[in-house]
Curated annotation (Swiss-Prot):
Cofactor binding summary note: Binds 2 Zn(2+) ions per subunit.
Lineage: Bacteria, Pseudomonadati, Pseudomonadota, Gammaproteobacteria, Vibrionales
Function of the molecule: Cleaves the N-terminal amino acid of tripeptides.
Family label: Belongs to the peptidase M20B family.
Keywords, sorted A to Z: Aminopeptidase, Cytoplasm, Hydrolase, Metal-binding, Metalloprotease, Protease, Zinc
Reaction equations catalysed: Release of the N-terminal residue from a tripeptide
Any one GO MF annotation of this record: metallopeptidase activity
Entries under HAMAP family matching the protein: Aminopeptidase_M20
Protein name, entry field: Peptidase T
Gene Ontology cellular component annotations, sorted alphabetically: cytosol
Localization in the cell: Cytoplasm
Binding site for Zn(2+) 1: H78, D140, D197
């Protein structure tokens, strides 16, 4: 465990932001550099079958140390960080024995405040790792990588802990929805796996959104504004009308738990043509279909109102709820719960209001729920993680391996 924090602090200095407009895999050269460093570290640790493929996927195995058959299990984390905030020149800072109040982030005016982030009230006495207020931290998901590798390092050194074959993998471009695109499930050779990509201590997740992207294109008529009377149709005004027609109370800032939403995530505006990007989320497949139908109805309604100009909408499916693929294998969740309880961690089963590599992998034949990292406030400059949460994740990974081996000895 002694190498955990240093390992994490080293990993976050790699600039690995994924780039959604680059369709190569990985989408950024920083991920290639980080993947090479991880590949070399895994070789040095002495893991077996260490590989780095042309798409930047790193895989390795820890062979079984028991003399009876145990299904191979896997642990997965992703190397990229979110494009939503700067991920370059990350300068983590450690706050020891937090006792409440605002935490100054670096030398600027940014603070981490319990007023804005009430979870801090529950973390008195914990040791935190924060940003310096200028970048994200990268705990999502470099904490998961550090935790998996540290667990493998300890299991390699301590033969008294029984375990079957363990496969590990580190993927590129998860943050832009492509983490499973080139994942070789057959090569990974696990019966099931866990992504270590969750938040606070105890999180255990096997439900996620059904997801789609909607593109709304508004077509106008552009003319010289000096001669535009009764002729110009401003596509930006049409786009504004459409935005106001959407349900205001079904947006991310007004929803929680199992509630889905419409999220206007981007726009490209001009008089002649304006384009709106929405992400649609719902835990039920029928709910996602209903959201798409509502958008189609709003487009038809707006087209009827327009004397000139027109609107069209198209959809692209992103990922589906892994619940239907994980629930038929209840032992996967039960073993994770048992491992947490054995580590004095209370399991907190909740839906993922997002997606993980595990969601896609579950539909590729590798059931793959999600386990906590100990982190908070991902994708922004107020991201932080507790050292205690990271240590608990390492313990749970090792205990899961042990519990699985003992379960199949019986």
């Amino acid at each position: 465990m002694k190498n955990l924090v240093g390992r994490f602090m080293r990993y976050v200095t790699f600039d690995t932001q994924s780039k959604p407009k680059n369709h190569h895999c990985p989408s950024s050269t920083g991920q290639k550099v980080f993947a090479q460093a991880l590949y070399e570290e895994l070789l040095e640790l002495g893991l077996s079958d260490v590989s780095l493929d042309d798409h930047g996927y790193v895989m390795a195995k820890l062979p079984s140390n028991v003399n009876y058959p145990v299904p191979a299990i896997g642990f997965i984390a992703h190397m990229d960080t979110s494009p939503d905030a700067c991920g370059k020149h990350v300068k983590p800072q450690i706050v020891e024995d937090y006792q409440g109040g605002d935490i100054a982030l670096g030398k600027g005016d940014e603070v981490l405040s319990p007023i804005q982030y009430p979870d801090l009230h529950l973390l008195h006495g914990y040791n935190l790792i924060t940003t310096d207020g200028t970048t994200l931290l990268g705990a999502d998901n470099k904490a998961g990588i550090a935790e998996i590798i540290t667990a493998m390092e300890i299991l390699l050194a301590d033969s008294s802990i029984p375990h079957g074959d363990i496969s590990i993998a580190f993927t590129p471009d998860e943050e832009i929805g492509r983490g499973a695109n080139h994942f070789d499930v057959a090569k990974f050779a696990a019966q099931w796996a866990y992504t270590i990509d969750g938040g606070p201590i105890g999180e255990l997740e096997y439900e996620n959104f059904n997801a789609a992207t909607a593109t709304v294109v508004c077509h106008g008529v552009n003319l010289h504004p000096g001669t535009a009377k009764d002729k110009m149709v401003n596509a930006m005004h049409i786009a504004a009308q459409f935005i106001l027609m959407m349900p205001e109370n079904e947006t991310p800032q007004h929803t929680e738990g199992y509630q889905g939403f419409y999220h206007l995530s981007g726009a490209t505006m001009s008089v002649a043509k304006s384009e709106l990007k929405y992400i649609l989320r719902d835990f039920e497949a029928s709910g996602l279909q209903a959201r798409q139908a509502l958008m189609q109805a709003k487009v038809a309604e707006l087209n009827q109102q327009l004397k000139k100009g027109r609107v069209e909408v198209s959809f692209e499916q992103s990922y589906s709820n892994m619940k239907e693929k994980v629930e038929p294998h209840p032992h996967i969740i039960e073993l994770a719960k048992q491992a947490m309880v054995a580590c004095d961690v209370e399991p907190k089963i909740k839906p993922i209001r997002g997606g993980t590599d595990g969601a896609r992998l579950s539909f590729m034949g590798l059931p793959c729920p999600n386990i906590f990292t100990g982190g908070y406030n991902f994708h922004g400059i107020h991201e932080f993680i507790t050292i205690e949460g990271m240590e608990a994740a390492v313990q749970v990974i090792m205990k899961l391996a042990e519990k699985t081996a003992l379960h199949y000895r019986q």
